[in-house]
Amino acid sequence: MALKFNPLVASQPYKFPSSTRPPTPSFRSPKFLCLASSSPALSSGPKEVESLKKPFTPPREVHVQVLHSMPPQKIEIFKSMENWAEENLLIHLKDVEKSWQPQDFLPDPASDGFEDQVRELRERARELPDDYFVVLVGDMITEEALPTYQTMLNTLDGVRDETGASPTSWAIWTRAWTAEENRHGDLLNKYLYLSGRVDMRQIEKTIQYLIGSGMDPRTENNPYLGFIYTSFQERATFISHGNTARQAKEHGDIKLAQICGTIAADEKRHETAYTKIVEKLFEIDPDGTVMAFADMMRKKISMPAHLMYDGRNDNLFDNFSSVAQRLGVYTAKDYADILEFLVGRWKIQDLTGLSGEGNKAQDYLCGLAPRIKRLDERAQARAKKGPKIPFSWIHDREVQL
């Protein structure tokens, strides 16, 4: 979503190959237990350490939580934007009757040709490599954790759905956005089930673990931070699904390419909506918004599924991310490109009349993307071929990181 960034946390943007990074501390890993037992308060022995491991805790450490960091008077900004949101935000939603549904892309169970359609789907899926399925499954699991994302939006002061059926424009947007996003996980889940290439039970466990763990975006109930985060993430998912579409086509599965491309188009439309909110905030409060943008980038944007766990692998998100990086589905360069795009979209270079802190934030943001790209280029030049590891999602078949 004072915070201390853990340099080992998997959400850092310029990822290095897993073979060259130390493992991320985990609630389940020996390293975390070692760190915990070195604390004076926990020096009595392993039983005391073990007793602190509560059920349903995330698989890795989360940051110190900061709450309600937006000054209360700024809530009025979002109340004043109600009419603006109705006219400029809700237009990016599609009428349900005109929207695509998962069944539009899948074999029809009511038709006489259902079994033949499933056989054709499975034949096409046989041509897709295991590493592609690892990335597709990871993307699907990310989409299926939608309850967490709606919860996150409803933590934001001034825009949350206060009743569950609030008539405010902000609440209508959140519910309708969630309803549109819900189709993404449904469609990918059903496709993967029919493909016969994956271990659905392990995938379902991963989804349950992930929703139970939540997410740690470090947005502090602050809609400035929250909408900057969602602007970044919607563009990231647009890129990721667009790349899985392209690769499905390269492997000969035109139907899967259509599925991923359709989801990518939704993400692009949602990105447009969220970036418009932040653009309006820059118009109303340029100083506060540029400092919020810099704050999120200093903390580094964490991916929504960074607390992913399958019951076995504490470093599952790192491993999934490494495969996505190697295949070119979502990379450190993409992270820098998104930042560069948003800096241009919101015209950060052209902001004037800022405070001293605002000017510092502006300078930081304008220089950050080139710096990330330089770091990534050096990392790629030093990168070694990653090891092969088993993924439970594909029946423990091994895939190179």
UniProtKB/Swiss-Prot annotation:
Gene3D superfamilies: Ribonucleotide Reductase, subunit A (1.10.620.20). Residues 1-35 form a transit peptide. Keywords: Acetylation, Chloroplast, Fatty acid biosynthesis, Fatty acid metabolism, Iron, Lipid biosynthesis, Lipid metabolism, Metal-binding, Oxidoreductase, Plant defense, Plastid, Transit peptide. It catalyses: octadecanoyl-[ACP] + 2 reduced [2Fe-2S]-[ferredoxin] + O2 + 2 H(+) = (9Z)-octadecenoyl-[ACP] + 2 oxidized [2Fe-2S]-[ferredoxin] + 2 H2O. It is found in: Plastid, Chloroplast stroma. Binds 2 Fe(2+) ions per subunit. Its EC number is 1.14.19.2. GO terms for biological process: defense response; fatty acid biosynthetic process. Changing T219F: Sufficient to trigger a significant accumulation of omega-7 fatty acids. Ubiquitously expressed. Fe cation 2 binds at E181, E234, E267, H270. The modification N-acetylalanine is found at A36. PROSITE patterns: FATTY_ACID_DESATUR_2 (PS00574). Its cofactor is Fe(2+). Induction: Positively regulated by LEC1. Up-regulated by jasmomic acid (JA). Disruption phenotype: Increased level of stearate (18:0) and reduced level of oleic acid (18:1) in leaves. Spontaneous cell death, constitutive PR genes expression, accumulation of high levels of salicylic acid (SA), enhanced resistance to Pseudomonas syringae, Peronospora parasitica and Cucumber mosaic virus, and enhanced susceptibility to Botrytis cinerea. GO terms for molecular function: metal ion binding; stearoyl-[ACP] desaturase activity. Fe cation 1 binds at E143, E181, H184, E267. GO terms for cellular component: chloroplast stroma. Pathway: Lipid metabolism; fatty acid metabolism. Homodimer. Converts stearoyl-ACP to oleoyl-ACP by introduction of a cis double bond between carbons 9 and 10 of the acyl chain. Required for the activation of certain jasmonic acid (JA)-mediated responses and the repression of the salicylic acid (SA) signaling pathway. Belongs to the fatty acid desaturase type 2 family. This is Stearoyl-[acyl-carrier-protein] 9-desaturase 7, chloroplastic. It comes from Arabidopsis thaliana.
